[in-house]
Amino acid sequence: MGTSLQLISPATGLVIHLVNSTGTPVAGGSPFLPSTTPFGTRSEWTPAAAAADLLERGGGPFANGSDLAWLSYPTIDETIPLLWFGTAGEAGRAVQMLRDQFAALYAQPCLLYCRPSGATTGVYFEILSARVQEAEFDGTKRSPAEGAAAVFIDLEIRRRPFAGLAALETLISAATIGNTGTGSPDNDIAYEASVTVKGDLRFEGSPLNVRLTKPTGQSPVAVHMASIYSRAYQSIASAKTTSTTTTFTASTAIDVSALRTRAGLKLRVVGRLTTLTSPSNAQVRATVQTASGATLAVLPWVQLGSDTSAQFVDFGATTLDALRVPLSNTTSVIILGEIKSLSGSVTATLSYIEVLLYYDYCIVECSAALSTSQRLHVLGAQNLAGGGWLPMLAPAALITDGSDAPVRTAVVKGTAPRAYAGASFWIGWVDANGAHTASDTAALTVTHAPQYRSLGSVS
């Protein structure tokens, strides 16, 4: 299959072909058909690969430079070198036609569609703005201003750094997922159980769209979701009553060796409390310790809700930098939970904990409980211009009815999950006042928008 290079404008509704499918521009031909277009490229142009903007940390005297804290990618400025073969006086028409494609202030951006020769798949870049400059064609005696029939055109564009495909790829399709870390189904599903995560960001995180139907039992007001490297579940079953502060039974050793070699991972502790009395007067926290009991991190106190049956608790996260050292032994931690009373006697049983080594974690606040047939959507990818699926500038969340008509918005707090090779999707949901039903299930669909820096990995 031959090379295809197109400008697709939501503003004009026109598709202009910048490369002739026969390999030779047709003088005076229609630019709206691949076989008759008078446009061509002057050189072996290919989209420039995005260079990352780095957010660094550390450094200073005697340090080996700085550590990488975050990656982002800026817009790209580049020039597409075009030529136009027309008939007498047509150069002005070609220039105006190109300029009209970018009248996008009150429309979605013009799309640059690229399909390399021999590839079956094309990708779409969003062009934010463009400058069209005509120039004299080599070997001619007439400039564009003098009505030259053939001209060079420099198409100077500012575009987004990534290109997307015309369709999302489904990683998880209407799968039943649980609300606890054990049993079948449990609360995590591998992204690559049936489909490989693709694209140039598969190890950096590429956008996901998540759809969760209302669970079979609960009516969630908040949903926790994450992209995780691993999850460790441990039953604790420790009951405590106190008017001051006391500790639950500690977990056994949990392997966190991956923190040494995967700098972006963080550790998070979540858990479930049952059989509560006066929970509104209680707070809990978790301490991360070495396998021998030395304190590594003390997470903040968490206020409990009012539900007395069972509550889901997000104890918080830590980077555990103290363990990122070059030792060969397995690196393990134990988790010690505590409960304290703010007033009077309080009782709770720490049923279990889960320790997540995670890439991304967020809490989606639904503003009101999900009702029958409603769905929660967390959207990291968009195709508003009608072409490829590209990242949202910021992930959006909303509640819809069963036909996906919007009902109300929701709020994403934290970093919405992204797709990583080898990672899994993890979830937990709660009703009002922190109420948690471990046996609850829901249908989950997760779709993925592969992103491409250039055409080198497009097939």
Model-assigned labels for residue ranges:
Residues 21-35, 40-41, 218, 225-362, ...:
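Polar, enzyme-active/binding microenvironments
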